[in-house]
Amino acid sequence: MAEFLQIHEPGETPMPHADDNVAVGIDLGTTNSLIAIAHEGAPEILRGTDGRGMVPSVVAYLDDKVVVGADARPVLLDEPERVVASIKRLMGRGVEDLKTLGGKLPYDVDEAASEGGMVRLSIAGRSLTPVEISADILRALKNRAEEALDRNVEKAVITVPAYFDDAARAATKDAAKLAGLET
């Protein structure tokens, strides 16, 4: 179907791109994450209500809720089995890959549920993949952006390290999709 030029009287022209969604930039880091937008040609970090731009990449799974960031850190002292940090290291990794990491992981691997190659961790009675845990971090960042911008955020550009292989990149995309973000 052909699209025709729309001509309006002066002062009656609709705002261009008024219905477009905003795309955000996300640095999903191993230790900390942040979310930003481009404002007047420069990046602007979206800060939380606490004024902080950085969000620790830490997730606590409590009985009734998921807590992300600085609020999850205190749980680490009292109930470390409920907290996950540095999950990015396991993105796109299979069960066999864990053997190459050396040392013991601070998490219990759910061996029964990990069949088929995808790592599943047993955290606070839940069986979670690194993708699901990363999605919780991305969801918290998305919520921060929506509060700061007072609009829905559905699109994002997410940075990944150069060493990420195709599996880790795909896992990051899957996490974004679970969080409601199109990459």
Residue ranges and their predicted role:
Residues 1-56, 61-183:
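N-terminal phosphate-binding loop and flanking beta/alpha elements of the actin-like ATPase fold
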